[in-house]
Amino acid sequence: FTDHVDYGPYRDWDDPRGIQYRPGDEGEPEQVALTNVDYKKYFSMIEKMREKYREKIAIKAGLEFGVQTHTIPEYEKLFRSYPFDFIILSIHQAGDQEFWTNEYQSGRTQQEYNEGYYKELLSVVQNYHNYSVLGHMDLIVRYDSYGVYPFEKLKPLLTEILKTVIADGKGIEVNTSNHRYGLSDMTPSRDILKLYKELGGTIITIGSDSHKKEHLGAYIDWAKEELRKLGYTQ
């Protein structure tokens, strides 16, 4: 399990400043709380499930850290506070501006927001090290209304990011939610996966990024086959 934590725009449920809310979208409550995980309840529930299913499956406890450079100290503190088995490192915002709402992209050119995204990601992996894999590395593609920005223009930044990840002994995630979002390429792209392999990267995990039970495990076998086609054999 890797529930989300996004310090910056989101607060912990017990933050003394109180809980923030946003208006609910269709199918949601009228007001939606902008909070991170209730960590004590989260880990308690995982322990209960481990006990219940111990003869059937191994249940691991993790989180997805949505890190920004300025929020790194909060994640350092959180990492020291609980017994994690696995951490996905992602960025979902830059400067506390969301990608999924196009808040970050607004007022910027396609070049500016793509380069800005990867510069922030590079800064994060250079300065934060308590994680297992880098999640949905080219997330910005999902929310790029102009289409896919040319790989070759981003290759120098992508190379530095991947070199840093590899030198740190970390891996990257193949995220199969590209199917849900109607993307034609893998996440990250095949070009990024080829570059990772060329640079000596070997650690890859596959995740379905499940936010609903019907998403669980979707396209995992497909991702394995695509990785084999790219030369990943272990």
Region spans (language model):
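Alpha-helix N-cap and loop-to-helix initiation/capping positions
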Residues: E30-K41, Q105-G116, Y149-P156, S184-P188, ...
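Charged catalytic cores and adjacent phosphate/nucleic-acid-binding surfaces used
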Residues: R11-D15, V125-Q126, V141, V148-Q234
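Surface-exposed cleft-lining segments at the edges of enzyme active sites
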Residues: E98-Y113, L139-P150, H179
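Hydrophobic faces of well-ordered beta-strands that scaffold small-molecule active sites
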Residues: F1, I59-L63, I87-L89, V133-G135, ...
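Active-site beta-loop-alpha junctions enriched in small/polar residues
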Residues: H4-D6, G62-Q68, H92-A94, D138-R142, ...
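Hydrophobic alpha-helical segments and helix pairs
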Residues: I57-Q110
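Acidic (Asp/Glu)-rich catalytic clusters
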Residues: M45-E55, E76-I88, V125-H129, E160-G169, ...
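An N-terminally biased module of ancient metal coordination in phosphate/nucleic-acid-related enzymes
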Residues: F1-F65, Y143, P150-E152, K212-K213, ...
